Amino acid sequence: MNAHTEKLTVQGPAGLIEVLRDRPEGVSRGHAVIAHPHPLFGGTMDNKVVQTLARAFVQNGWVALRFNFRGVGASQGQHDHGVGEAQDLLHLVGQLAPEGALALAGFSFGAYVTSHAIEALHPQRHIEKAVLVGTAASRFEVAPVPPELHDRTLVIHGEADDTVPLASAMDWARPQGLPILVVPGGSHFFHGQLPQLKSWVSRHLSAHE
């Protein structure tokens, strides 16, 4: 953790939720809530892809909120196959980012959870940016991205992802006409490519509508 990282606990729907809040230098652009990969396969808020997403947001002026899903780390409760996890995410938005600019991001299972959080929040809550990485479309019913958010959404997938095949992500995106940034040779965890991942996310965050 760096000097601008705070550890928080928030009372959630299934008990306490463990949160890390990373703050940027100066005035922030808003809050970004970042969801981690599958808890039953070792996913936590300390996952390297999740940390990379947080760094990209912080370096672009956002407060990054990482959290452990229910039953992970110090977060209470039990794994709920994405349903309760989406409730946790929405609860954190209400508690820690109730107003102002909001961005949502997720990796793998976290992208699945984030897709349903977007579905629940839109259009009542404006979502400034969305980032979905290694979206677990082969394993879960990922919600479509509302057409109004396509220009504000970055979907990244590794060409050589052997956890979530690229074809499944394409099958999810194709009916929506939603572009995917395909990383040549990229694995599910973007081994050796995390600096490039951060660069692509930063470029998305710095783009103006």
Question: Where would I find each of the regions flagged by the language model?
Answer:
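Serine-hydrolase catalytic machinery in alpha/beta-hydrolase-like enzymes
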Residues: 10-12, 16-99
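Active-site nucleophile loop of the alpha/beta-hydrolase fold
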Residues: 37-38, 131-140
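Short beta-strand immediately N-terminal to the catalytic nucleophile in serine-hydrolase-like folds
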Residues: 104-106, 133
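Gly/Ala-rich beta-loop-alpha elbow adjacent to hydrolase catalytic centers
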Residues: 106-114
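Acidic catalytic loop of the alpha/beta-hydrolase fold
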Residues: 138-139, 159-164, 188-189
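Short beta-strand/loop motif that positions the catalytic acidic residue
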Residues: 149-150, 155-157, 161
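Conserved loop-alpha-helix segment in the C-terminal half of the alpha/beta-hydrolase fold
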Residues: 159-178
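Catalytic histidine-centered segment of alpha/beta-hydrolase-like enzymes
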Residues: 186-198
